[in-house]
Amino acid sequence: MNGDDAFAKRPRDDDKASEKRSKAFNDIATYFSKKEWEKMKYSEKISYVYMKRNYEAMTKLGFNVTLPPFMCNKQATDFQGNYFDNDRNRRIQVERPQMTFGRLQRIIPKIMPKKPAEEGNDSKGVSEASGPQNDGKQLAPGKANTSEKINKRSGPKRGRHAWTHRLRERNQLVIYEEIRDPEEDDE
């Protein structure tokens, strides 16, 4: 028996793949007129499908990507002859964020004011009030002394050690012991 004949007689499992392909083609066909779509070769249609997939993937990742030329505001008709510019229900444009989530997280702490510490958890007020700078004078809980104002202004430098904010502070002290090699002691 010939192997090619057996392969040809087997029912194909490409039904799902062909459905996905036709759905992708229908999505792309909305950007072209009926005449343009009929003139296009299969390879051109596939390349447009991949362009649209790449564009959608990049925007989901948060990159600022320019819209492919065929997806720009071009008046096109679907296969029923309806203009998409007139049909607002079918052509809803979603506003894409211009900024990634990571950039937004770095900006928000600068914009948002710091919350005042609770009186029960404020350990800085006691130690700073009796320091040599204050000459033993008590400070009001809402007012900061001049050294605190200077320290607030001179925060960590932006470009230097950018990863340090990601490190967590250890709750328990970790002690390391040096491991000695018995062979080194003999020498």
Swiss-Prot record:
Entry superkingdom: Eukaryota
Cellular component annotations (GO), alphabetically ordered: nucleus
UniProt region (Disordered), positions on chain: 1-21, 109-187
Tissue expression profile of the protein: Not detected in any normal or tumor tissues.
Entry keywords, A to Z: Phosphoprotein, Transcription, Transcription regulation
SUPFAM superfamilies noted in UniProt: KRAB domain (Kruppel-associated box)
Key word Magnesium present: no
Basic residues bias spans: 152-168
InterPro entries linked: aKRAB, KRAB, KRAB_dom_sf, SSXRD_motif
Sites bearing Phosphoserine, chain numbering: S123
Keyword Lipid biosynthesis in annotation: no
Cited Pfam families: SSXRD (PF09514)
Xref: SMART domains: KRAB
UniProt GO BP: regulation of DNA-templated transcription
Disulfide-bonded cysteines: none
Coiled coil: none
KRAB-related domain sequence ranges: 20-83
PANTHER family: PROTEIN SSX6-RELATED, SYNOVIAL SARCOMA, X MEMBER
Function: Could act as a modulator of transcription.
Family, per entry: Belongs to the SSX family.
Name of this protein: Putative protein SSX8
